Amino acid sequence: MLIQRGGLKVVAGLGISGVSAVNFLHEQGYQVAVTDSRPTPPGHDQIPAGVKTSFGQLDQELLLQAEEIILSPGLAPQLPEIQAAIAKGISVVGDIQLLRRATDVPIVAITGSNAKSTVTTLIGLMAKDAGKKVAVGGNLGRPALDLLKDQPELLVLELSSFQLETTSHLNAEVAVVLNMSEDHLDRHGNMLGYHQAKHRIFQGAKKVVFNRDDALSRPLVPDTTPMQSFGLNAPDLNQYGVLRDADGTLWLARGLQRLIKSSDLYIQGMHNVANALACLALGEAIGLPMESMLETLKQFKGLEHRCEYVKTVHDVRYYNDSKGTNVGATLAAIDGLGAAIEVKKGKVALILGGQGKGQDFGPLRSSIEKYAKVVVLIGEDAPVIEQAIQGATKILHAATLKEAVELCQRETQAEDVVLLSPACASFDMFKSYNDRGQQFVACVNSLV
C-alpha cells in the first residue's frame, strides 16, 4: 500500500502526456484523479487501479477539489473550468513542471516555430555519441516524465508553446528559441501571446543560444547569462555562422575557424546549415567535444518528412517536406534549397496546399519569385494561396498528389529540385502529414 502524499492531484486531459503524468504521480504515492471531456479518451485503459476517473466532460467539481491540476498540453488554460480553479487559487502546471521538480538533471531545452524536432534529435545524437547517458523527448517521441526511468545524466527536451504555457522556472542548462513565425494563433490569441509562451523557456536558464537572423528569438535575460548566437552570416569571435571561400565553398564556422563544409553534410539546404549551427552552439554549452559533434553531423540523415531527400530522377532531386505545415516552415525549405541550388542555376518546383489554418500566405511571395519556376497547388485552400502569390511565378493546379508530382516532373530539368512543402495541414486529402509524405514518396518512386 502506497502512503498517500499531500492533497489531490487532478490530471486534466489524457493522451500521451496525461497518461504519463497519472502514472508518475501514482508511483510517487500521490492521491490522483483524472478528468477528460471525451467519453473514452486515448490511454483510458492505461490508468492504474485506485485512480478516480471522470470522463465525458471536464469535471468542474473534481477540479475544484484539487490541490493542484496537471493540465495536458492539448487543453488551453483559458478554458472556463480551468479558469474557475485558478480563481480559487489552485495551482495549474504541466508535465514539464513536474519533471523539473522531480529531478535536477541538466536540461537542454529547445523550442521554435520550426526545426525543433531536427535540432532536438541531432543534439541528442551528439550527446550520445560523445558518451553521455542522454534521454530525448518531450513534445517529440517519449513524454518527458517517462524519460526519468532511464536515469539519464542529461535530458534533451523539445518543448511546444502549449507545454511552456504551464511551465515556470525551467532552469535549463541551456535554452534556445530557434525561430519565430506565425503558428497556433488560434490558441495564443496573437503573435505576442505566442512569443510570451515560447520565451518562458528562458526562465532561470544558465546559458542561452539564440538565432541572430531572427530578432524574435533573442531573449531578455540578465546580462550575466552567457549567450551564444548562430546565424547564416559571418560570425563574430566565439559565435557560430558561415564563411564563404572565393570559389563559393560554404563552411560552417566558429568565429574565424572553419569547421566543416556544408557540402559534407547529408542534410542539405541553408535552413539545415542553421540547424547544424544551433546544435554546435548547444553542444558547446554542455561541454561536448567539437570533433565528436562534427562526426555526428556528417552521419546525420535528417528526419522523415522534414526536407527529406527522396531520390534523384533524370538529374532532378525530390524532397519530402510534408511536415512543413505552416508558412514559416515552407519559407525555410524554399530559401534553404533555393539558395543551395542557385549556384548551378537550379530552380524549385513547389507543391503547396491543403488546409491553411487561416494563415497569411503573402510572406511566401518573394521567395517563390526568387527561387521557384513553378508552383503546383493542391487541396482545399488552393484558391486562397493562389490569390496571395498570383504573378510571382507560373501556377498550376492538380486534383491529386500524383498529378502534382507528374506536373513537376514535366516542368523541371537537370539541377532543379521538386519540393513538397505544403505550408498547410493535411486533413483535407490525407490522414496526417505522415500519410501525405508517404504518398509523395510512393509517387516519386513510381516516376519513370
Swiss-Prot record:
SUPFAM superfamilies with a match to the protein in the record: MurCD N-terminal domain, MurD-like peptide ligases, catalytic domain, MurD-like peptide ligases, peptide-binding domain
GO molecular function, one term: ATP binding
Catalytic reaction(s) noted: UDP-N-acetyl-alpha-D-muramoyl-L-alanine + D-glutamate + ATP = UDP-N-acetyl-alpha-D-muramoyl-L-alanyl-D-glutamate + ADP + phosphate + H(+)
Any single Gene Ontology cellular-component annotation: cytoplasm
Binding positions for ATP per the UniProt entry: 112-118
Any one GO biological process: peptidoglycan biosynthetic process
Enzyme class: ligase
Keyword Zinc: no
Catalytic activity, EC: 6.3.2.9
InterPro entries listed in its UniProt record: Mur-like_cat_sf, Mur_ligase_C, Mur_ligase_C_dom_sf, Mur_ligase_cen, MurD
UniProt keyword annotations, A-Z: ATP-binding, Cell cycle, Cell division, Cell shape, Cell wall biogenesis/degradation, Cytoplasm, Ligase, Nucleotide-binding, Peptidoglycan synthesis
Chief location: cytoplasm
Family annotation (Pfam families): Mur_ligase_C, Mur_ligase_M, MurD-like_N
Pathway this chain belongs to: Cell wall biogenesis; peptidoglycan biosynthesis
Cited Gene3D superfamilies: Mur ligase, C-terminal domain, Mur-like, catalytic domain, NAD(P)-binding Rossmann-like Domain
Localization annotation: Cytoplasm
Family stated for the protein in its record: Belongs to the MurCDEF family.
Job of this protein: Cell wall formation. Catalyzes the addition of glutamate to the nucleotide precursor UDP-N-acetylmuramoyl-L-alanine (UMA).
NCBIfam families: murD
Official protein name in the record: UDP-N-acetylmuramoylalanine--D-glutamate ligase
